[in-house]
């Protein structure tokens, strides 16, 4: 029996409308009744996630900003890592050949230079909102991460530009087909989960995890049992071909698997 279960949010635990389904909520509560520790491992901001777990009365550790922050059940910060200021400065003031919009995150929230109301659809359940500002006037100190949102092919070309400029000063990954993230070196959900599991006295082999995007790769590949969503990015399935693929987030597939696992732990699972 696993001691810790870690869940990505968008495309995994949440349905396509970015809401938490009733079956999923019920399955999570059953895990807690079995004394299995819950962790939400997400690219979302901790300010937003505090609202989410409060709304649903869930006791869960938080890995936020794709591994840049870890918070306890009580909201205590257990770990933090920021982008190197020179890397943040280079991104903020670079001249990038892209149509993608830039978004900057720090402990104060989410900041962008242009209104993108369509992006708020992913935050309807929490009400979390970007703050408009002149990004070139932002401090490069204490930046958690920077992300670019736009067309995937455009972002792939942008990634080449960013790699050429940043080199080994940052870690780049796709958290979705339309979102490219610039993170601190060595920062990912898997590394954060290793820190958290050690803090709790668990091994990664005693953890299970669920995800759908390339920012879940390290986490899924490092735990005892990693599960890929049926709706996952093709690149993730290709990178971790040995991991089982469950159903689609639109069908609350995580709850389907967990219900089977809790009720019939010794029987093989089929997503059908």
Swiss-Prot record:
The active site is at 8 (nucleophile). The keyword Hydrolase applies. It comes from the Bacteria. Keywords: Hydrolase, Magnesium, Metal-binding. Its cofactor is Mg(2+). GO terms for molecular function: 4-amino-5-hydroxymethyl-2-methylpyrimidine diphosphatase activity; magnesium ion binding; phosphatase activity. Signal peptide: none annotated. Belongs to the HAD-like hydrolase superfamily. Cof family. Catalyzes the hydrolysis of 4-amino-2-methyl-5-hydroxymethylpyrimidine pyrophosphate (HMP-PP) to 4-amino-2-methyl-5-hydroxymethylpyrimidine phosphate (HMP-P). PANTHER family: HMP-PP PHOSPHATASE, PTHR47267. This is HMP-PP phosphatase. It comes from Klebsiella pneumoniae subsp. pneumoniae (strain ATCC 700721 / MGH 78578).
């Amino acid at each position: 029996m696993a001691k810790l279960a870690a869940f990505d949010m968008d495309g995994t635990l949440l349905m396509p409308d970015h809401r938490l389904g009733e079956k999923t909520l019920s399955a999570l509560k059953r895990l807690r009744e079995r004394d299995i520790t819950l962790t939400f491992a997400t690219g979302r901001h901790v300010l937003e996630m505090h609202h989410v777990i409060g709304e649903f009365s869930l006791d869960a550790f938080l890995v936020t900003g794709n591994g840049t922050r870890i918070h306890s059940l009580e909201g205590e910060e257990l770990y933090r890592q920021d982008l190197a200021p020179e890397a943040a400065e280079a991104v903020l003031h670079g001249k990038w050949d892209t149509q993608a919009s830039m978004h900057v995150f720090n402990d104060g929230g989410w900041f962008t230079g242009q209104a993108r109301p369509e992006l708020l659809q992913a935050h309807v359940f929490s009400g979390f909102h970007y703050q408009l500002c002149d990004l070139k006037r932002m401090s490069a100190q204490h930046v958690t991460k920077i992300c670019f949102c736009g067309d995937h092919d455009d972002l792939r070309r942008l990634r080449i530009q960013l790699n050429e400029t940043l080199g080994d000063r940052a870690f780049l990954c796709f958290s979705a087909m339309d979102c490219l993230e610039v993170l601190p070196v060595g920062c990912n959900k898997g590394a954060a989960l290793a820190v958290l599991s050690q803090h709790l006295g668990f091994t990664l082999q005693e953890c299970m995890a669920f995800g759908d995007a390339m920012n879940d790769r390290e986490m899924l590949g490092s735990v005892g049992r990693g599960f890929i969503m049926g709706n996952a990015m093709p690149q993730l399935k290709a990178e971790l071909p040995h991991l089982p693929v469950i159903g689609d987030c639109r069908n609350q597939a995580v709850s389907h698997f967990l219900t089977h696992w809790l009720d019939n732990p010794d029987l093989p699972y089929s997503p059908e």
